[in-house]
Amino acid sequence: MRHGRGSAVSAAISGLSPAKNSPFPQLCNVLLVASLSKTLSQSGTRSLDANSIPISEPVVLQILRRNSIDPSKKLDFFRWCYSLRPGYKHSATAYSQIFRTVCRTGLLGEVPDLLGSMKEDGVNLDQTMAKILLDSLIRSGKFESALGVLDYMEELGDCLNPSVYDSVLIALVKKHELRLALSILFKLLEASDNHSDDDTGRVIIVSYLPGTVAVNELLVGLRRADMRSEFKRVFEKLKGMKRFKFDTWSYNICIHGFGCWGDLDAALSLFKEMKERSSVYGSSFGPDICTYNSLIHVLCLFGKAKDALIVWDELKVSGHEPDNSTYRILIQGCCKSYRMDDAMRIYGEMQYNGFVPDTIVYNCLLDGTLKARKVTEACQLFEKMVQEGVRASCWTYNILIDGLFRNGRAEAGFTLFCDLKKKGQFVDAITFSIVGLQLCREGKLEGAVKLVEEMETRGFSVDLVTISSLLIGFHKQGRWDWKEKLMKHIREGNLVPNVLRWNAGVEASLKRPQSKDKDYTPMFPSKGSFLDIMSMVGSEDDGASAEEVSPMEDDPWSSSPYMDQLAHQRNQPKPLFGLARGQRVEAKPDSFDVDMMNTFLSIYLSKGDLSLACKLFEIFNGMGVTDLTSYTYNSMMSSFVKKGYFQTARGVLDQMFENFCAADIATYNVIIQGLGKMGRADLASAVLDRLTKQGGYLDIVMYNTLINALGKATRLDEATQLFDHMKSNGINPDVVSYNTMIEVNSKAGKLKEAYKYLKAMLDAGCLPNHVTDTILDYLGKEMEKARFKKASFVRNKPNNNNISS
């Protein structure tokens, strides 16, 4: 110490024993703490003399509590005190204080060594300190050290408070360490089944059961991470334990999880179990509004919008008032299943009941309205959204721009995009991707490449969707050399080099001689004829079995009789297709190969090169790639149908179902198109009827496909009824719909009907295209023929009368 002052103080104090000889023990401690604090702050522990400093627990605690001393020097002092053993050992209070310092200052790497010293000193870690340590370690991501603390407590034979384990589980879930949380949970559940004997021979059950809050957090985490098998394992394990009881929130989580994963039977059985529990334990254990929201969401996912609407009507008179989430879920479900009239009705009721629609609700309504070809109504809805002060998002404008492009309003879409760019608002990478795709559709590749360059300049990353659209455009126009241009314009990231390497590798594989091991073996073996398609979409017996209700006692006091009836049904039919249509590019981290395969399938099939597409498909099958999307199978099946290879198309469909790839609306469009080409409009109608009865829906492409099939089969009355049905369901006919009705009526000789549809088309503001011109030429010739025929009949009639006279 400087100038010898410290040594003098130490010498003075060393001659005293604060506990016995000194009449001023507190003053001695104060002087000693001040001296030690100054020494530690200036030179650390190297100037301390163990023989001259009387260390006691009060002194150590005051040093550790001093805010003026650096935490690392406190830690050094704490370790320096080890050298005083066996004369001095740290107490539990001292360890608690140093642990608090370590946790507060982030020196958590010292925890394992401190625990080892604690064990040597024979000091036990208390419950409170263990919880603080665990929380700090988990927050800092030091999961191994946290497990070390748990092991340390178990070695001591100390049974931790269940709340400690609950906090650990919750913290791990929030840190997305679900595997670690699962291992701890199952370890706790195994320990809860263990039995031990006390001195009197009684059996003691070790209570390590986690709380419902921690379990609920874990189940939510597993659901969000799409860990289906782990979710089911936790659910079944807890259901099998008599001492663990699910609460209402647990049931709601499980209903939502099983429903979203396609297990409607499990979701309905859980609802039934909740109702039974409420009859025994009271209404507090029964379904609440969140339960009904989850069930309505599940029914909408299964395409059972009709059932969801009935449950909603029951809900309104059952004492459970619909909330904002209820309306949002129903509007989303109706918009996705093209029930726009129902969606707008619910939207109106939502406003009438005092709920304010948010951006998500308006986005769903805008998307559904534009897909239903109601451009004017969509624009009016957007204006209302702005007037009511609901903030539009990038997604809102993306829906508008994409909808304008798809409804033949490309100029309006480009104008809106340019206005947003000038303002510097509501434009993201998806907006650029949508506009770039439209430019590629129109063949304006130079503009698309410039747009990509601008996209990078503005700091947006160019995604695989945009690049694949450009590649398809290059191949369609034969611009093979333009692929290298992407390297100049897209400079950031490794995406473009990976795409070009993938392209070069596939082209080299396609040039290799094909293996002859599978010669004369069908690539897509079929299990039947394409005309046997009804067996694949389910039989009427399946639908009937779902309608059979198991015997149940009618509860006149039930608030949800229809929901009770659904819950008592067995073997609910699986949905025939998913509401979401398969995308060519999903742009997921693990789907690069499949995305690129779908892109090049589109390229080869658009050029009519079916053999090259089949070879590419075979290469990937040989590589063991099985996670193909519905887009892959739909593309292959559509090409075979167009070429008239119906048996092979059936084989593609069989392989699709064997690989558990869910069909979508595009799959059934191809099926109906194939049946129409085979002249079996009756089967096409039957497939569509079965589809709608089992929860399916029709989009405008499906309507157009079936109208065309019925018209070519001269079933004009049914085609007309379907056309009217489309309009009554809130879907405006497009140019393809009108062209089809004009053509089939013209060819059937119903010229007045054809002219009526032409006038309706123009009155609706639907712009004709080049196909319309061709059909109108044919209609004009037929009308001219009819005019000549009528005129010749009028001329011949007087002549015949003169001859007879």
UniProtKB/Swiss-Prot annotation:
Signal peptide: none annotated. It comes from the Eukaryota. It holds the Pfam family PPR_3. Keywords: Repeat. The keyword Ribosomal protein does not apply. The keyword Repeat applies. PPR repeats lie at residues 91-125, 126-160, 161-196, 211-241, 247-277, 288-322, 323-357, 358-392, 393-427, 428-462, 463-497, 593-627, 629-663, 664-698, 699-733, 734-768. InterPro entries: Pentatricopeptide_rpt (IPR002885), TPR-like_helical_dom_sf (IPR011990). PANTHER family: PENTATRICOPEPTIDE REPEAT-CONTAINING PROTEIN 3, MITOCHONDRIAL. Belongs to the PPR family. P subfamily. This is Pentatricopeptide repeat-containing protein At4g01570. It comes from Arabidopsis thaliana (Mouse-ear cress).
